[in-house]
Amino acid sequence: MFLEEYDVIVVGAGHAGSEAAAAAANLGSKTLLVTMSLQNIAQMSCNPAMGGIAKGQIVREIDALGGYSGIVSDRTAIQFKMLNKSKGPAMWSPRVQSDRMRFAEEWRMMLEGTPNLDFYQEMVKGLIIENGKIKGIRTSLGVEIRSKSVVLTNGTFLNGLIHIGEKQFGGGRAGESAATGITEDLVKAGFEAGRMKTGTPPRVDGRSLDYSKMNEEKGDAKPDKFSYSDLTKPLTQQRSCYMTYTSLNVHDILREGFDRSPMFNGRIKSLGPRYCPSIEDKINRFADKERHQLFVEPEGWNTCEVYVNGFSTSLPEDIQFKALRSVAGFENVKFFRPGYAIEYDYFPPTQLKHTLETKLVEGLYFAGQINGTTGYEEAASQGLMAGINAHLKVHEKAPLILKRDEAYIGVLIDDLITKGTEEPYRMFTSRAEYRTLLRQDNADFRLTPMSFEIGLASEDRMRRMEHKLNESEKMVAFFKETSVTVAETNPILIEKESAPISQGDKMFKVFSRPQIELEDMLKFEKVDSYIKENNLDEEIVEQAVIQVKYSGYIEKERNNADKLNRLEEVKIPENFDYNKIKSMSIEAKQKLSKIRPVTISQASRISGVSPSDISVLLIYMGR
């Protein structure tokens, strides 16, 4: 049935698996995507949205590298918002509300249109490992499929266990079976496994809600999009979301079910996402809060199904229903399906290399929730990098490893490999020490050249990026070269409560003042004329303005990154014996021996390794 060997087999067709398969196939590897259900490719198992704080930056990075998530998100969006717009550009984060059904449909169409990609529907029960190398997979029907590399992207399906009140049953997602066999094979091969938990809220009938009792949350008046390509356009119409609140009465009703809650009666022992707690966890941990926000999110253009964001729960369904009926606007709510919690297997990511290849088995890669992360975007980015690196290894090419100053994806993977995680890991802007460099507006500058070099990003993408870069640099040069007069400048400065100038000055210096915004710059006739004469779009103008207003911060961060990157150049031999260093702490020796950092810089980020330990290590490395 499968007569030839594949270059890459991807197991699981969620967000990680879809990106992994697309990347490997687009790069030229003969790729097979294996899933338990071809009808459920790229499902949005939880909220119908992509992006958000730090996550939006990741989606733009995926797009800049030639992945599909940004394009699919744009084509299936029903609302766009740029979050944190009141803060500096390092914090701006794009987010879309998505049409859940169209999202999965669009992903499948994109994958079916990808050359070199085959599909197969069946459960993978085991792995073929020979002499420490992956050789293929074994399915539930006993079919063996050979491959030079395998990417595991199993999501919440590995021995998944669903909880609703006192009921529990096996499943990887509501209505779908759990996957068995893979964990057992990996543990037998020497891998360490653990358990994690996540949850999802009930879905309800939007026709049964009274939106007049809620606050309307509209999308941006001038919506943007994720993809840097010309394959998508910004939305011309949008659907609103709504916001309402729980109350003390709602909390009292929820507490009635605590004795039947798997979270409180000991049935669930694994840790859930710290930054996305269940509603019962919120009212238990924050008992002083009189109310909690609930976001009422439509699931698409042509459905009345609604996602109740903020009400994730594993309480009994009767308690869920009774509590929701006490929420303003939900008095007559009708349930489509209850919320639930799910426990699943994961593998501590310190067992991986920065390529996402496992240290134990050559050619085997992990991506997504199997690594202990939570979120579509985190999963998709790992899948993309695993797919890229699986292809590069099979074809004996150098790996693509993103540094912490190059991408949020680099921060994510480095955190996982270097620090590990004992609870579902989600990305935040605060995790990135170089977030002024890693903005959502410049992901193409940072990453498209790398992707183009390995053959993933198209020539059209590269040309578009170069045009944007050249034109924005020309505009910055124009600001530096062009002077403004006292007469045209001071009225604007006084209006903005900024100190007036006593003589003419360069635009760059005036515009770098924090009080001056883009609309103030456009009041200068020379600026307005320059933009019109050069036919510059908003993206180019915004990029130039950011370079002017934040040049000091950007330069400082770049210098700091360059200093630390010097330590990235100091390599540590693969089998270095840390136990021979007598002046190093025992904890440092243990951590370094377990994680096996590749560079001094990575070693310095490991918890329990002190600056003095690094100094000793540098001496041993001859520095």
Swiss-Prot record:
A Pfam family recorded for this sequence: GIDA
Location (main, coarse): cytoplasm
Compartment annotation: Cytoplasm
Gene3D superfamilies, per database record: FAD/NAD(P)-binding domain, GidA associated domain, C-terminal subdomain, tRNA uridine 5-carboxymethylaminomethyl modification enzyme MnmG/GidA
GO cellular component: cytosol
Function text: NAD-binding protein involved in the addition of a carboxymethylaminomethyl (cmnm) group at the wobble position (U34) of certain tRNAs, forming tRNA-cmnm(5)s(2)U34.
Family as reported in the entry's similarity comment: Belongs to the MnmG family.
Record-given protein name: tRNA uridine 5-carboxymethylaminomethyl modification enzyme MnmG
Gene designation: mnmG
